[in-house]
């Protein structure tokens, strides 16, 4: 597997509040990368790079403890995932979420006599412009075998399949948390943590 770091980068966050999860690590013979919600495990024999069991002297969690036993075998196709994502496009919004585009925010202060004072000031987030850099508005959850997955998890699964040049992936445990996906004839495991179903979000069925 050449340049597997590109694949691993899909699964971890270099700004993660847990320092030990800011880079890939070696764990029980598996090269692992996780942000705490999604996880990939690749047999080290498939990887070109070298990885530490204690990156930066820190001890990562034992990922084997969260890998569920295979209990089913459901094929998920790239086409199914792509179709679901097309039904739930990312929405971009430049309006400042703090001031709602007005450029001003109102704050209050209660003095020692319990009098409340209101003051309108320039919004500190957008500096009064009313706009911010584009951010994603999440309005959807994706249903896989009755479980809800977030947009980022589903998009990462599709990106990993594209990187691995595979059109199908096996869902081998849909009941556990996390859910376990495995490519055919490849010692790779992808685990996605389901979300609590949010009644305020629209749902899109994958399978």
Label for each model-derived stretch:
Residues 1-42:
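Intrinsically disordered, low-complexity linker/loop segments enriched in Gly/Pro
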């Amino acid at each position: 597997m050449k340049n597997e770091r590109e694949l691993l980068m899909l699964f971890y966050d270099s700004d993660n509040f847990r320092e030990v999860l800011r880079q890939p690590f070696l764990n029980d013979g598996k090269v692992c990368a996780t942000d705490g919600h999604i996880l990939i495990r690749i047999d080290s024999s498939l990887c070109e790079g070298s990885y530490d069991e204690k990156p930066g002297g820190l001890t990562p969690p034992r990922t084997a403890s969260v890998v569920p036993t295979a209990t089913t075998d459901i094929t998920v196709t790239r086409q199914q995932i792509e179709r679901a994502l097309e039904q739930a496009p990312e929405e971009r919004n430049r309006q400042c979420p703090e001031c709602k585009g007005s450029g001003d925010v109102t704050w209050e202060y209660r003095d020692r006599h319990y009098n409340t004072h209101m003051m309108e000031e320039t919004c500190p987030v957008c500096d009064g412009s009313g706009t911010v850099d584009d951010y994603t508005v999440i309005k959807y959850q994706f249903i896989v075998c009755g479980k809800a997955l977030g947009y980022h998890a589903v998009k990462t699964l599709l990106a990993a399949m594209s990187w691995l040049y595979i059109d199908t992936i096996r869902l081998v445990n849909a009941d556990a948390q996390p859910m376990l996906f495995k490519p055919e004839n490849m010692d790779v495991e992808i685990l996605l943590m389901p979300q609590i179903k949010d009644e305020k979000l629209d749902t899109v069925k994958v399978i």
